[in-house]
């Protein structure tokens, strides 16, 4: 994984964990969990691409990797919508900056995962 992407994930996760969104803290914790899961999935796909011979290993380990890929894209879309919603309702500039960076990161990671998946197909 690109070192900038790693630091972006870590920075956004740290910033989100510091936010106090009142009654919606459960939602925020869910978003943080989704971000962490997405980070791990993106890393594993990237590693599989780096070892192109690993495609067969990936498919044999997880015969349903295409379904898993589809599920990850659904999670990304959900996170994008959730982040956009947060951007619309927040007036706190720290939160706005954090969610804008999170949105940018999600769009970049979605594109990277698409690129990786096409290389694996």
Curated annotation (Swiss-Prot):
One of its GO terms (biological process) is exit of virus from host cell nucleus through nuclear pore. One of its GO terms (cellular component) is virion component. Its main location: virion. It holds the Pfam family Flu_NS2. InterPro entries: Flu_NS2. The keyword Metal-binding does not apply. It is found in: Virion; Host nucleus. The keyword Repeat does not apply. It comes from the Viruses. Keywords: Host nucleus, Host-virus interaction, Transport, Virion. A motif (Nuclear export signal) lies at residues 12-21, 85-94. Belongs to the influenza viruses NEP family. Average number present in a viral particle is estimated to be 130-200 molecules. Mediates the nuclear export of encapsidated genomic RNAs (ribonucleoproteins, RNPs). Acts as an adapter between viral RNPs complexes and the nuclear export machinery of the cell. Possesses no intrinsic RNA-binding activity, but includes a C-terminal M1-binding domain. This domain is believed to allow recognition of RNPs bound to the protein M1. HAMAP family: INFV_NEP. This is Nuclear export protein. The lineage of its organism: Viruses, Riboviria, Orthornavirae, Negarnaviricota, Polyploviricotina.
